[in-house]
Amino acid sequence: WYSSMFAANIKQEPISHHHHHHHAHHSHHQHSHDSNSNSNASSPHQSPLPSPNPPSSNNLQLEQYLKQQQQQQQQQQPMDTLCAGAMTPSPSNNDQNSRLRPPGLPNPMQTIMPANMRPSPTATTTATTTAAAASTTTAATVALQSNDKLQALTPPMDVTPPKSPAKSQQSCAEPEKEHDLMSNSSEDMKYMA
């Protein structure tokens, strides 16, 4: 999930460069992990206690498994900081990354981002749509009222004059509506950030 989002975000960066980095990290960690497991495996062979071998080998497997888990978590972290660093070109992400990284979780982006990102888009969309609906209705009512006033003010004249002011009033209300939408969305963004 987040890797696809992250890949989409990275498009402006040279992808090969990023992947190369990722691989460098990966192979480096793989190597250290291998040497770790080797030293672990060699130490029990050196110990001259063959009798409690089954339980100790069991424990060893468990230990190695745990170590591997830790190693994997650590392995993901450079990827995350790398991903966060690579995502910094877009400013909106910058904010979220700086907030997402401080909690010292093994995998901050994956654990927090779904929780952070999934509810918030719905929240913002509902907020903007309601705001947009409100602004359009207000603009429409304003236009209607002024139309009524114009027509009420100019009944004795011909039918064409009230129409042209009505048109200009419409075009006047149109940018206003867009401005409302813009200010609303920017306020939402401020609220989000």
From Swiss-Prot:
Keyword Membrane: no
Domain of life where this protein originates: Eukaryota
Start-end of Polar residues biased regions: 89-99
Biased composition (Basic and acidic residues): 174-193
Keywords of this entry: Developmental protein, DNA-binding, Gap protein, Metal-binding, Nucleus, Repeat, Zinc, Zinc-finger
Subcellular location: Nucleus
Ranges of biased composition (kind: Basic residues): 17-31
Disordered as annotated region, ranges: 16-126, 146-193
Keyword Cytoplasm: no
One GO term describing the cellular component: nucleus
Function description: Gap class segmentation protein that controls development of head structures.
Family according to the record: Belongs to the hunchback C2H2-type zinc-finger protein family.
Protein name: Protein hunchback
